[in-house]
Every structure is written in structure tokens, then in C-alpha cells.
């Protein structure tokens, strides 16, 4: 999906992160990094490499658990520019409202996406936070 974002945002530089070192790559306007989403030190080690860069858009398409979403947000939101957008994808209905409670003091919306496939109804939600 990183290549899709690069092609969609013609002037953007894309930064990706994954826990699977075997799928990391660098390509035209794309850099990927190893990050353990539930380890604050791992997240902050990545941000140290990009100390002078802030982001317009951040998309969490990681582990899809409450804890992982919370930890990544807590250690990454400071890298979002003013008026930037932070998106957590594929949020399960099992912890959607826990995340909503966590984000109650932030400007956020919950997007419940419908699907014709029954198995997609459980984790086809998003939380969008605007700085």
C-alpha cells in the first residue's frame, strides 16, 4: 500500500514501518523502517532518525489491537503537523469504544464502514484524529 500512497500523493515522501524485517524496502520516495509498535523505545528510535521531519498524514495500519494503537499514537502524535490527520485503520468493534474513550480529549471521529462481506464487519472501522 505504500506504493499506492506514493502514486496518489504525487509530491509526498512516504515513510513506512513494520515489525517484519524481511519486507522492509526503499524505493523512489519511500523509506521503510523496522518498528515494534508495542515498544515505545523502538518507535522513538525511528523518530530520532527523522527528528527534523513532521507529517501531514499518519496512518496506523499496524497490529490492530487497542494496546498497539494506543502506544503508537502516544509515541507518534508529536510528529504530526498542526492541522495534520492521524488515522487508525481496521479498528475492531471489540475495542472501538475503548479507543473512542481514549481519544475523548482529541478532535476525532469514528467511521464505521459497512461491507457486504460478514467477516469484514468486525474490523472495518477507522478512527480519524485531527491535530
PLM regions and their residue ranges:
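SAM cofactor-binding core of SAM-dependent methyltransferases
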Residues: 1-40
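Extracellular structured ligand-interaction cores
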Residues: 2, 59, 124-126
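Short, flexible, glycine/charge-rich loop motifs used to bind or transfer phosphoryl groups or to couple energy/partner
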Residues: 4, 21-23, 46-48, 76, ...
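Charged/polar, solvent-exposed surface patches and flexible loops
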Residues: 7, 44-48, 101
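Short amphipathic alpha-helical surface micro-motifs
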Residues: 13-19, 53, 108-112
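Active-site segment flanking the S-adenosylmethionine/decSAM binding pocket
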Residues: 31-95
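C-terminal substrate-binding/active-site "lid" region of AdoMet-derived donor-dependent transferases
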Residues: 66-131
Amino acid at each position: 500500500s505504500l506504493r499506492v500512497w506514493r502514486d496518489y500523493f504525487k509530491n509526498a515522501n512516504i515513510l513506512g514501518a513494520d515489525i517484519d524485517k524481511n519486507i522492509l524496502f526503499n524505493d523512489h520516495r519511500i523509506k521503510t523502517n523496522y518498528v515494534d509498535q508495542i515498544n515505545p523505545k523502538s518507535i522513538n528510535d525511528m523518530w530520532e532518525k527523522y527528528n527534523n521531519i513532521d507529517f501531514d498524514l499518519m496512518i496506523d495500519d499496524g497490529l490492530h489491537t487497542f494496546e498497539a494503537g494506543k502506544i503508537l499514537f502516544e509515541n507518534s502524535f508529536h510528529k504530526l503537523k498542526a492541522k495534520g490527520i492521524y488515522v487508525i485503520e481496521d479498528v475492531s468493534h471489540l475495542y472501538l469504544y475503548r479507543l473512542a474513550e481514549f481519544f475523548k480529549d482529541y478532535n476525532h471521529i469514528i467511521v464505521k464502514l459497512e461491507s457486504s462481506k460478514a467477516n469484514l464487519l468486525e474490523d472495518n472501522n477507522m478512527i480519524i484524529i485531527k491535530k
